[in-house]
């Protein structure tokens, strides 16, 4: 049995970025489920400041997914890079009749949960979840009509390789959309304070995401 102490050790001293990412999501799984009201979303969500704040955080998460993909042609095969537990892909595939989505992820237990979610929502004919590395995809050239990565790109050890792979696997008129977490220097005093507190509890710091 893997203990929390072992997970924390793997997170802090893990030999690879992949190990740290897997451990990070394993440790914070209960928190993400609480944040998403157990609807399997792992992203932070998107709130338009000109609108009243939604009653449910799930609404903001759905807003994020819809906003990221709003300029896509709503047909063909899409790729969800860093698909989490499958909620974004399932949400989009229910919205649009003429699309299919493949999701890739390096966190095995999330793939299992994504497949369960697809079965529960009766979407097995429209979504597929596979183990896959965003920086070294198995897909053939020009496989996808659109590719999106929602709050996952900051994990990629070599972001240039991801861009190259996205370019290789996109069809000529395909689009790539990325939602990332951006660090603002003017917030340095606040983030430096919280960085110390976060590190004490074994959570990810800015340096972990940026590769510093």
Over which residues does each language-model region extend?
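N-terminal auxiliary segments of SAM/dcSAM-dependent transferases
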Residues: 1-35
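Conserved alpha-helix/loop element of class I SAM-dependent methyltransferases that forms part
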Residues: 55-75
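Class I SAM-dependent methyltransferase SAM/SAH-binding core
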Residues: 77-79, 85-136
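A short acidic, Gly/Pro-enriched loop at the edge of an enzyme's catalytic core
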Residues: 135-147
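A short SAM/SAH-binding and catalytic strip from SAM-dependent methyltransferases
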Residues: 146-157
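A short glycine-rich, Lys/Arg-flanked "PGG" loop and its adjoining helix->strand segment in the class I
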Residues: 160-175
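Short, glycine-/aromatic-enriched active-site segment of Class I SAM-dependent methyltransferases
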Residues: 182-205
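Short alpha-helix
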Residues: 206-212
């Amino acid at each position: 049995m893997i203990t929390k102490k072992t997970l924390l050790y793997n997170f802090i001293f893990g030999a690879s970025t992949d190990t740290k990412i897997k451990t990070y999501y394993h440790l914070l799984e209960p928190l993400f489920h609480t944040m998403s009201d157990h609807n399997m979303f792992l992203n932070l969500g998107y709130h338009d400041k000109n609108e009243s704040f939604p009653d449910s955080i799930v609404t903001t998460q759905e807003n994020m997914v819809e906003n990221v993909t709003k300029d896509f042609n709503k047909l063909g095969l899409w790729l969800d890079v860093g698909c989490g537990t499958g909620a974004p892909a399932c949400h989009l595939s229910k919205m649009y009749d003429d699309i299919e989505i493949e999701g890739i992820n390096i966190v095995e237990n999330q793939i299992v949960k994504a497949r369960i979610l697809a079965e529960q929502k009766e979407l097995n004919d429209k979504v597929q979840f596979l183990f896959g590395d965003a920086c070294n995809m198995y897909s053939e050239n020009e496989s996808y009509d659109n590719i999106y990565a929602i709050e996952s790109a900051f994990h990629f050890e070599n972001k240039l390789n991801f861009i190259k792979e996205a370019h290789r696997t996109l069809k000529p008129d395909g689009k790539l959309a990325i939602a990332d977490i951006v660090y603002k220097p003017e917030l340095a005093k606040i983030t430096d304070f919280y960085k110390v507190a976060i590190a004490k509890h074994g959570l990810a710091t800015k340096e972990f995401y940026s590769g510093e």
